[in-house]
């Protein structure tokens, strides 16, 4: 093989990786799955090309078939890779999650940003009769959750606009529009705490703060029934900020200046 052939081979390999990444991003934006035709339309590739890439991703469990109904969604290997990459942060933060959950008697979670969504890395579920229960690994729109808002607020403006995309999801009657969200993110940068009041799910409220660690940015969030939120909001915000301080002291911050 001469130098020209080698360069062509490298370029082809890079193109395949880029196409696979675009397909996975499309599936990540549609957690319930997409048909081959829908994927091809979204990424602007021939259906036959999408089929070949999907087959390769499926062999690595990065994509999985939905069953007899057809279509594909992101596979379990992606979550496993994320969890493996986050092993250090999980073990370091776990004791603080437990402590915060016990102090407030509410569900607590640790999350990271994945595109326009948050990925729940770990959680402690409250033992109360009326509580909010959610699984590890769940992906939810960042713009409609407190955990997502603190992570979005940490992004530079150009990156933020790209992360928000052209159209924000409308999940409830309380979901914020772009203008209101951008204004709220500016306030979050000042206060250090974000909230969502029935914006993701009716009856569910959350509060969150940003963890600025040498391992990257994460969000620490309290998720609770809305019926308890108004009376406890000040207490929750104070507890979150204290927990943030404790965690960043123990782990080490990535920057000296808050984003």
Swiss-Prot record:
Residues 14-76 form the HTH iclR-type domain. Induction: The ttgVW operon is induced by toluene and styrene, but not by the antibiotics carbenicillin, chloramphenicol, nalidixic acid, tetracycline or gentamicin. Keywords: DNA-binding, Plasmid, Repressor, Transcription, Transcription regulation. GO terms for molecular function: DNA binding; DNA-binding transcription factor activity. InterPro entries: GAF-like_dom_sf, HTH_MetabolicPath_Reg, Tscrpt_reg_IclR_C, Tscrpt_reg_IclR_N, WH-like_DNA-bd_sf, WH_DNA-bd_sf. The keyword Signal does not apply. The keyword DNA-binding applies. Pfam families: HTH_IclR (PF09339), IclR_C (PF01614). Residues 89-253 form the IclR-ED domain. Represses the expression of the ttgGHI and ttgVW operons. Binds to the ttgGHI / ttgVW intergenic region, probably preventing binding of RNA polymerase; ttgV dissociates from this region in the presence of 1-hexanol. This is HTH-type transcriptional regulator TtgV.
């Amino acid at each position: 093989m001469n130098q020209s052939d080698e360069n062509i081979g490298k370029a082809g390999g890079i193109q395949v990786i880029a196409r696979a990444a675009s397909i996975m991003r499309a599936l990540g934006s549609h957690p319930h799955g997409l048909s081959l035709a829908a994927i091809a339309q979204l990424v602007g590739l021939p259906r036959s090309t999408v089929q070949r890439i999907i087959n390769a991703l499926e062999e690595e469990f990065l994509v999985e078939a939905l069953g007899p109904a057809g279509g594909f969604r992101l596979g379990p290997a992606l979550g496993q890779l994320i969890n493996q990459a986050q092993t250090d942060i999980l073990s370091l933060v776990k004791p603080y999650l437990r402590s915060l959950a016990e102090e407030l008697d509410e569900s607590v979670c640790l999350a990271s940003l994945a595109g326009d969504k948050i990925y729940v890395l770990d959680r402690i579920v409250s033992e109360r009769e009326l509580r909010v229960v959610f699984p590890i690994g769940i992906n939810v729109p960042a713009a409609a959750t407190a955990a997502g808002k603190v992570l979005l607020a940490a992004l530079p403006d150009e990156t933020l606009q790209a992360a928000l995309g052209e159209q924000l999801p409308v999940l409830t009657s309380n979901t914020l529009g772009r203008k209101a969200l951008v204004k709220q993110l500016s306030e979050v940068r000042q206060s250090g705490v974000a909230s969502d009041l029935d914006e993701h799910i009716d009856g569910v409220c959350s509060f969150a703060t940003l963890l600025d660690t040498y391992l990257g940015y994460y969000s620490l969030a309290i998720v609770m029934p809305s019926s308890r939120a108004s009376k406890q909001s000040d207490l929750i915000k104070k507890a979150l900020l204290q927990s943030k301080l404790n965690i960043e002291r123990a782990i080490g911050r990535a920057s000296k200046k808050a984003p």
